[in-house]
């Protein structure tokens, strides 16, 4: 691939009625739905929960990558992403890192991992969103 051509990645969401979609990503199917209290069937996480899942998992992997590059062993790791709703968006996002590794070992990994995390970088840079009408779905 030419160096001047950016890499791209796509996922497909197919509406299944109500508040439910089936998303295909890398050959995997994900169900997206709203809770019953919001008119959905509760058959899957909400889109915003998938956003938080993407952020927490991407940061966890970036943190492990950052540790590996520095020869640091993390015996265990949990990353919790929490978003604060403010109308139709999150007004704030918090990543909470839990590990039995000492804080003085983990602290130097935090910023490099944040720089390496595609999801947090994308959210922080707020890229423009273009909507294109493609015609009838396949």
Explain the meaning of each model-derived region.
Residues 1-53, 61-138:
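Extended beta-strand/beta-hairpin segments
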């Amino acid at each position: 691939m030419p160096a001047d051509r950016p890499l791209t990645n796509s996922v497909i969401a197919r509406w299944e009625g109500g508040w439910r979609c089936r998303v295909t990503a890398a050959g995997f199917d994900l169900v997206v739905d709203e809770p019953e209290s919001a008119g959905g069937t509760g058959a899957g996480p909400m889109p915003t929960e998938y956003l938080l899942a993407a952020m927490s998992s991407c940061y966890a992997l970036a943190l492990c990558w950052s540790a590996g590059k520095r020869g640091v062993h993390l015996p265990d790791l949990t990353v919790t992403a929490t978003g604060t709703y403010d109308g139709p968006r999150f007004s704030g996002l918090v990543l909470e890192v839990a590990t039995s590794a000492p804080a003085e070992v983990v602290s130097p990994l935090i910023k490099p991992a944040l720089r390496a995390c595609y999801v947090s970088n994308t959210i922080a840079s707020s890229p423009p969103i273009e909507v294109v009408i493609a015609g009838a779905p396949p």
